[in-house]
Amino acid sequence: MNLNATLFAQMVVFLVLAWFTMKFVWPPLINALDERSKKIADGLAAAEKGKAELDAAHKRVDQELAQARNDGQQRIADAEKRAQAVAEEIKANAQAEAARIVAQAKAEAEQQIVKAREALRGEVASLAVKGAEQILKREVDQTAHAQLLNQLKAEL
């Protein structure tokens, strides 16, 4: 094997190149690769975090929708109950008003009956006096006539 000086020179140049590369080129490459892997890891973590937040947001939205539906149904049920209560109150008021009108009509009818009886008593008393006067063929004076009418009214 023939070793000559060019081989040693090539080895020295290679070692200088290796040292230069290790000293000046290799650290920025390692830093760039580390930064890149860190950015990728941060991006993946952010994506995972975003996905988790999205899932949480979906759950919150679903819960709020369910709550809104429940609230809506509750409000509808409350409105129906209030409407039914108002209808019952109106019905009760109408029945009370009808009973009051019937009672008033009965009272008016009773008053008319009493007035009619008084009028009939007066007429009957007057007819009785006239009949008695005609039977007795004598005239009764006005004061005696009024007293007789009052007595007959009281008796009837």
Curated annotation (Swiss-Prot):
Top-level taxon in the UniProt lineage: Bacteria
One GO CC term, this protein: plasma membrane
SUPFAM superfamilies: F1F0 ATP synthase subunit B, membrane domain
Transmembrane segments: 7-29
Function: F(1)F(0) ATP synthase produces ATP from ADP in the presence of a proton or sodium gradient. F-type ATPases consist of two structural domains, F(1) containing the extramembraneous catalytic core and F(0) containing the membrane proton channel, linked together by a central stalk and a peripheral stalk. During catalysis, ATP synthesis in the catalytic domain of F(1) is coupled via a rotary mechanism of the central stalk subunits to proton translocation. Component of the F(0) channel, it forms part of the peripheral stalk, linking F(1) to F(0).
Subunit structure: F-type ATPases have 2 components, F(1) - the catalytic core - and F(0) - the membrane proton channel. F(1) has five subunits: alpha(3), beta(3), gamma(1), delta(1), epsilon(1). F(0) has three main subunits: a(1), b(2) and c(10-14). The alpha and beta chains form an alternating ring which encloses part of the gamma chain. F(1) is attached to F(0) by a central stalk formed by the gamma and epsilon chains, while a peripheral stalk is formed by the delta and b chains.
Protein name, per record: ATP synthase subunit b
